[in-house]
From Swiss-Prot:
<dbReference type="InterPro" id="IPR001222">
    <property type="entry name" value="Znf_TFIIS"/>
</dbReference>
<feature type="binding site">
    <location>
        <position position="234"/>
    </location>
    <ligand>
        <name>Zn(2+)</name>
    </ligand>
</feature>
<comment type="similarity">
    <text>Belongs to the TFS-II family.</text>
</comment>
<dbReference type="InterPro" id="IPR003618">
    <property type="entry name" value="TFIIS_cen_dom"/>
</dbReference>
<keyword id="KW-0804">Transcription</keyword>
<keyword id="KW-0863">Zinc-finger</keyword>
<dbReference type="Pfam" id="PF01096">
    <property type="entry name" value="Zn_ribbon_TFIIS"/>
</dbReference>
<dbReference type="GO" id="GO:0003676">
    <property type="term" value="F:nucleic acid binding"/>
</dbReference>
<dbReference type="GO" id="GO:0006351">
    <property type="term" value="P:DNA-templated transcription"/>
</dbReference>
<keyword id="KW-0479">Metal-binding</keyword>
<protein>
    <recommendedName>
        <fullName>Transcription factor TFIIS homolog</fullName>
    </recommendedName>
</protein>
<comment type="function">
    <text>Putative initiation factor. Necessary for efficient transcription elongation past template-encoded arresting sites.</text>
</comment>
<feature type="binding site">
    <location>
        <position position="206"/>
    </location>
    <ligand>
        <name>Zn(2+)</name>
    </ligand>
</feature>
<keyword id="KW-0805">Transcription regulation</keyword>
<feature type="zinc finger region" description="TFIIS-type">
    <location>
        <begin position="202"/>
        <end position="242"/>
    </location>
</feature>
<dbReference type="InterPro" id="IPR035100">
    <property type="entry name" value="TF_IIS-typ"/>
</dbReference>
<feature type="binding site">
    <location>
        <position position="237"/>
    </location>
    <ligand>
        <name>Zn(2+)</name>
    </ligand>
</feature>
Length: 243
């Protein structure tokens, strides 16, 4: 009986904000069917209630997700994600000295990722949410490998206030890391423009027919500071191999 009263109350609260009885009943019923205990039911329905009350979910957004309705991003999981962002930002002196600001930024960054994910259709909610949060966490990490230290554009802009934490979740890699994106684009352009003219040489032995009559070409398939990859073709048997 208590569970029935609780469900009626939740339906009333959801419908009050969504103003869509059919959609409200569909959300509530899906959460109820997924849960095998009252505790899990409340755990599943809570994100919908909170987002509706704070006007972070519109009818259109929920209808886009109505085919999958995955309320598995619980508050506990969101807390874990926020803790991940908090630990990452705390690695930087600026945020260690400004704990309150760090907490505010963490909440806004996570919320930005969460709301962005609601609008995606290609992947399931959980997969998209986890992937985006992981990407953002890597980008704002000040303890990157030495060759990535110059790519802290997003973190520096976050500290200076140029980048708003509530906007970070919907930004592309190129927008967050213009230096790294430009470097990557330059490498791709250079690779596409490189000369791939074939040369003949007896330096390379064919592993198939054991002859040393091969043509070869050099291709820059890795980073620019690493050696080129040499592709060989045996003129005797036509076998292709890497020199």
């Amino acid at each position: 009986m208590k569970m029935h009263i609780a469900r009626d109350s939740i339906v009333y609260l959801l419908n009050k904000h969504l103003q869509n009885t059919i959609l409200t009943n569909k959300i509530e019923q899906e959460c109820f069917l997924q849960a095998d205990t009252p505790k899990k039911y409340l755990q599943y329905i809570k994100p919908f209630l909170i987002n509706c009350m704070t006007k972070n979910i519109t009818t259109d957004l929920v209808m886009k997700d109505s085919k999958r309705l995955e309320p598995y991003i619980t508050l506990e999981m969101r807390d874990i994600i926020q803790m991940m962002f908090f630990r990452t930002l705390q690695k930087h002196t600026f945020f260690r000295e400004n704990t309150n600001l760090c907490t505010e930024y963490v909440q806004k960054i996570e919320a930005s990722c969460y709301h962005y994910t609601y609008q995606q259709q290609e992947k399931t909610f959980l997969e998209e949410y986890s992937t985006r949060c992981g990407m953002i966490n890597h980008i704002i990490n000040c303890e990157k490998k030495s060759h990535q230290q110059q790519d802290n554009d997003a973190l520096n802009k976050l500290i200076s206030g140029e980048l708003k934490p509530e906007a970070i979740g919907s930004m592309t890699f190129a927008e967050l890391c213009p230096s790294a994106a430009l470097k990557e684009k330059t490498e791709i352009t250079l690779r596409s423009q490189q000369k791939v003219a074939e040369k003949t040489s007896q330096l390379y032995k064919c592993p198939n027919c054991k002859q040393r009559m091969c043509t070869y070409r050099e291709v820059q398939t890795r980073a620019l500071d690493e050696p080129s990859t040499i592709y060989c073709t045996c003129k005797k048997c036509g076998h292709e191999f890497i020199g």
